[in-house]
Amino acid sequence: MKYLFYTWKLGCLLLLILAGCSSKKSVSSYHSFESECLGVELDGSETLRAWGRGKNRTDAIEQAKKNAVRDVLFKGVVAGSRECSVRPLITEVNAQERYASYFNDFFRDGGEYLKYVSMEDKKTNSNMKTSNKTQISYSTTVRVLRSQLQQKLIEDKILKP
């Protein structure tokens, strides 16, 4: 009887030790920060929800505009509605590096990319915000003028007609 009691006690102790050694389950949220298609207009422009990060709200929204144009140019828009073109405007491999001086100037603060971004479709309170200790992330609704952007790249001899 004593032997059975000690065996049972040892089994419970072993079970508690093993349960305490399990990895801790952390609760965290993951949010994809890639541009998402919301629709396409009849003029060929694409309405996107784009994310940007910055020190404050203004910086984050400007970065979101740059990210939207960059996604249309180099990555294509895969997430969201299937109306947007999955194919990027520039399909040439390493085009961003090859034409680095052109795109550095194009995407500088206050640069030419702003001519191809419109905030027409932005609705009141449509921004989403996440933050950590050092940066704020905002999403905003942006319309990228894809056909005008394509024409500009053809004129600048980045794309072939």
What spans do the regions from the language model cover?
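Sec-dependent bacterial lipoprotein signal peptides
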Residues: 1-21
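Domain-level marker for long, solvent-exposed, non-transmembrane regions
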Residues: 21-161
